[in-house]
Amino acid sequence: MFSRSTLCLKTSASSIGRLQLRYFSHLPMTVPIKLPNGLEYEQPTGLFINNKFVPSKQNKTFEVINPSTEEEICHIYEGREDDVEEAVQAADRAFSNGSWNGIDPIDRGKALYRLAELIEQDKDVIASIETLDNGKAISSSRGDVDLVINYLKSSAGFADKIDGRMIDTGRTHFSYTKRQPLGVCGQIIPWNFPLLMWAWKIAPALVTGNTVVLKTAESTPLSALYVSKYIPQAGIPPGVINIVSGFGKIVGEAITNHPKIKKVAFTGSTATGRHIYQSAAAGLKKVTLELGGKSPNIVFADAELKKAVQNIILGIYYNSGEVCCAGSRVYVEESIYDKFIEEFKAASESIKVGDPFDESTFQGAQTSQMQLNKILKYVDIGKNEGATLITGGERLGSKGYFIKPTVFGDVKEDMRIVKEEIFGPVVTVTKFKSADEVINMANDSEYGLAAGIHTSNINTALKVADRVNAGTVWINTYNDFHHAVPFGGFNASGLGREMSVDALQNYLQVKAVRAKLDE
């Protein structure tokens, strides 16, 4: 299926934990890859530092696996502490010499907009790389790339709109504030939306004048490395964006603890987020954390049922359920519960699961063997806890990390499948009698990332939205993102916001200036 260099060997992956590390003295900086849809491209293999692809200091590499075939795609260079050091020094020089933060803000915006245009011109290949690397359906990857393009363009428009204020302190003094960039920002992105999270991280950092050292997820580094080739073409100076591929315990730790990094942004699990928060606190670094979720999706009896079912489908099975804000806890008003279960079961069983390059596929592969095993483990936990398996719960096929859409009924609120984030296409369905009851159930969680409300009564929708503990509430829709709307969580779901003007505040600090005037 794939053409590889002689250094990229076809193997079978039993788990992501089996990623093989190898030493190559002459691994080329690009390898040719032919995609399943017939497109061909050159995949960068190096780290991206100072606007160049470079080998890692130790020449160590690791393999990248295709989740839908369990075959190796290629090897890329593995960054380590000394590579992070080189990237941080490059970013620090770029910040100190003013090549980015010292230029006209309009020029920063133009460069970011140009980067979006270059991605747009190559979006078919980029979407295909995302599907190859992550296993998600090609339709989802195309949607991701469109979101990337729109967000970069939107962010570019904020470049010349970062201002301070003049403060009237009397005739004897002139007082004002200005908002300034922080410096070098460390960014750590997940494997479920590799390129979209790359954009969510770099755009607000760059438009505010910061420089970046970014770690890709070890299982999905390809798309971020590929689009990095467009960074110099966009007019972004050397050292402004640096990409170090590698493992969390090495590269992630080095980024989090580096004294020259002033802020850390992370998307991933709550457990890892807590660790990063504690480590960053030791260096008094700013943090943005977009973490886990166990989001409620509420269906009232007056909802238009067929539309509600489709929204619930999108809420849990989109991106193979590997979404931090997935609507994995569904609550249905008692009077329509049986009818809902009937329609939701049928809709779940009709979903096309399989080859992610097939245009009719809605749910592709899980990203890794490890994640598939975790999901199947939770299916067993649900059965053992006494929940009713309504449909699914089985691996699909013998090759590739596929699982059938899975629905549990007859659940209790203290069950692990209700409380814990599964991060896959597994959903629980519970009945409720009143708005007060469902709000209490929805809020009975350590998380607070998102919620969905389905009703034809706008009063009900707005009142419930106000009382649900969630950073984002969708009404009669779900997983409905827009670059102008902020995204982030409450409680154990994180700190700070992604997207929109709100994201910019995470990358700025306020300076107050007060001058005494001559009499």
Curated annotation (Swiss-Prot):
InterPro entries on file: Ald_DH/histidinol_DH (IPR016161), Ald_DH_C (IPR016163), Ald_DH_CS_CYS (IPR016160), Ald_DH_CS_GLU (IPR029510), Ald_DH_N (IPR016162), Aldehyde_DH_dom (IPR015590)
Catalytic activity, reaction form: acetaldehyde + NADP(+) + H2O = acetate + NADPH + 2 H(+); propanal + NADP(+) + H2O = propanoate + NADPH + 2 H(+); propanal + NAD(+) + H2O = propanoate + NADH + 2 H(+)
Positions with a binding annotation for NAD(+): 268-273
Modified residues (Phosphothreonine): 216
Active site annotation, chain numbering: 290, 324
CDD domains: ALDH_F1-2_Ald2-like
GO biological process per UniProt: acetate biosynthetic process; ethanol metabolic process; lipid metabolic process; NADPH regeneration
PROSITE patterns: ALDEHYDE_DEHYDR_CYS, ALDEHYDE_DEHYDR_GLU
Residue(s) at site: Transition state stabilizer: 192
Compartments where located: Mitochondrion matrix
Keywords on record: Mitochondrion, NAD, Oxidoreductase, Phosphoprotein, Transit peptide
Transit peptide, UniProt annotation: 1-24
Gene3D superfamilies, alphabetized: Aldehyde Dehydrogenase, Chain A, domain 1, Aldehyde Dehydrogenase, Chain A, domain 2
EC number(s) stated in the UniProt entry for this protein: 1.2.1.-, 1.2.1.4
PTM annotation (Phosphoserine): residues: 96, 500
Function: Potassium-activated aldehyde dehydrogenase involved in acetate formation during anaerobic growth on glucose.
Name of this protein: Potassium-activated aldehyde dehydrogenase, mitochondrial
Gene that this polypeptide is encoded by: ALD4
